Structures are given as C-alpha cells and as structure tokens.
C-alpha cells in the first residue's frame, strides 16, 4: 500500500496538472469557452499596456498569452503524466508562472476576486513541491551522539541516548499566579 505522502503528491500532481492543462488551453483556443477566451485576450492586453517594457522587448499581448498558455499546457501534461524529477521541475515553472500572473494582476489593479484562484493554486503548488521534496522520515534510524560529545566517564563510544528535554521536565500540575 502506498504511503499517505505518496497518495497526496500523486493526487496534487494530477489535479494541478489537469487544472493547468485546462487553463492553458483556454488561453490558446476559444473551443472550450468563447467567453473565457475573450476575457483572457482582454486581460493580457491590459497586462502589456501596464508594462511598457514588454512592448519594448517586442512582446505583444498575443505572444504573451500564447506563450504562457503553451507553458501551462506543457507543464500540466508533465505534472499529470511524467513521473520523477521532471514533475518537480514543471511544478517549479508553474509556480514561477503563478507569481508572474499575481504580479500582473497587482500591476493592473485587479480586485482580489479576479486573482484569488491564482493565490490558491500558488499555495497548492508550493505545498506539493514541499511535500515531494521533503526528505524521508528518519525516525527508524538510530540516533547517534554528536562527535566529540563524550559521556560523563569520558568514553567517546558511549551510545546511550540522552533523555529529551520533555523527559527531564517535571510532570504534573503547575501553579500559575
């Protein structure tokens, strides 16, 4: 049976991957939703107007929208279907994209309800990346005393564990005044 951590990472990967494939497709084509597609076109025009540096670099709203949409679709497919390290790389790129989108929303002065989904999915991407990259639990490994920390009798090879602070603390009720 898979560990809860593995189930969580797989569930987040598939859900986030499908979401970004869907959102990227909406940016690329009106076939899924004409209203959402036209709204994306309008939003990306305002992003390019608010950031003149993009125009100076030769990036128009169509190129920006299609580039971000294609990157979302590609990373979403990787998040959904490809195992291992590429999934974490796609997660990282999507996280950078979400941060860029949040920046654009702030730049044009959009209200929170227009970009709340980006905040939520940014948090989910961060959680997925942290869970996936967290080292395995090492509670089964034996704890060893740090080097140079000899026991009271001077034996460096003393492997007895020191009691934790919790075990040393007095147990029972405390009087607070």
UniProtKB/Swiss-Prot annotation:
One of its GO terms (molecular function) is acetylcholine receptor regulator activity. Residues 136-177 are annotated as: Disordered. Residues 1-5, 83-88, 133-177 are cytoplasmic. It comes from the Eukaryota. Keywords: Chaperone, Cytoplasmic vesicle, Endoplasmic reticulum, Membrane, Peroxisome, Transmembrane, Transmembrane helix. It is a multi-pass membrane protein. One of its GO terms (cellular component) is endoplasmic reticulum membrane. It is found in: Peroxisome membrane; Cytoplasmic vesicle; Endoplasmic reticulum membrane. Belongs to the DoxX family. Molecular chaperone which mediates the proper assembly and functional expression of the nicotinic acetylcholine receptors (nAChRs) throughout the brain. Essential for the proper folding, assembly, function and surface trafficking of alpha-7 (CHRNA7), alpha-4-beta-2, alpha-3-beta-2 and alpha-3-beta-4 receptors. Stably associates with ribophorin-1 (RPN1) and ribophorin-2 (RPN2) (components of the oligosaccharyl transferase (OST) complex) and with calnexin (CANX), both of which are critical for NACHO-mediated effects on CHRNA7 assembly and function. This is Novel acetylcholine receptor chaperone. The lineage of its organism: Eukaryota, Metazoa, Chordata, Craniata, Vertebrata.
